[in-house]
Amino acid sequence: MSTKSRTRSKTRLSRALGIPLTPKAAKYLEKRPYAPGEHGRSKRKQDSDYAVRLREKQRLRAQYGIREAQLKIAFQEARRTQGLTGENLVEILEQRLDALVVRSGLARTTAQARQLVVHRHIMVDGKIVDRPSFRVKAGQMIHVKPRSEGTEPFQVAAAGGHADVLPKLPSYLEVELDKLQARLVRLPKRAEVPVTCEVQLVVEYYAAR
């Protein structure tokens, strides 16, 4: 799929879910804040309970850019963990390496963060990690491989070039962009994680399966 096609696909998905998944999609949603299709402007008919829960699950999955199987595994772990399942789920997903790379400003989008990880530009505590799903633990340091620091994507990041599209830095991260590094100082809490999702609806979706 070409870059143009991927952008168009993300924009269409953003409109369908009602959330911006990329900076370009955010601008598009400002102009057309309705679902794609010829009837997008008209008032939508009342969705069924199942449709509402399904859409909320899709919104969470899309914001982390993960497959259904990955989300289901995370949900099963969240259900086994003490506490509220929905909150546990978001907190588990937020510990993904690709999520923290974009959250810290080292990448502009989740897709770019995943690419940087897969191409072995990212290290955790001095060791290269090429799995976007890698679970970062509290206290661990995420940083750019020294040989990659001078490349254009990281020079842009070091200059704060993504600040215009990323949410405010959450307090569970300590970031030094000039050094291209970020530390997960503690585990995230759901209320701090900048994702749009009614997590209880996601719990209800899986509970009914």
UniProtKB/Swiss-Prot annotation:
- Listed disulfide bonds for this chain? none
Residue numbers spanned by region Disordered: 1-20, 28-49
Q: Which GO terms describe its cellular component?
A: small ribosomal subunit
Look up keyword rRNA processing and say if it applies: no
Concerning PROSITE patterns, the annotation shows:
RIBOSOMAL_S4 (PS00632), S4 (PS50889)
Q: Which SUPFAM superfamilies match?
A: Alpha-L RNA-binding motif
The domain of life is Bacteria
Give this protein's Gene Ontology molecular function annotations. rRNA binding; structural constituent of ribosome
Residue stretches of biased makeup (Basic residues): 1-13
Q: For the S4 RNA-binding domain, which residue ranges apply?
A: 95-176
CDD domains named among the record's database cross-references: S4
The family classification in the record reads: Belongs to the universal ribosomal protein uS4 family.
Q: What does this protein do?
A: One of the primary rRNA binding proteins, it binds directly to 16S rRNA where it nucleates assembly of the body of the 30S subunit.
Name used for this protein in its record: Small ribosomal subunit protein uS4
* Organism of derivation: Clavibacter michiganensis subsp. michiganensis (strain NCPPB 382)
Which lineage is the organism of this entry classified under, starting from the top rank?
A: Bacteria, Bacillati, Actinomycetota, Actinomycetes, Micrococcales
Gene of this entry: rpsD
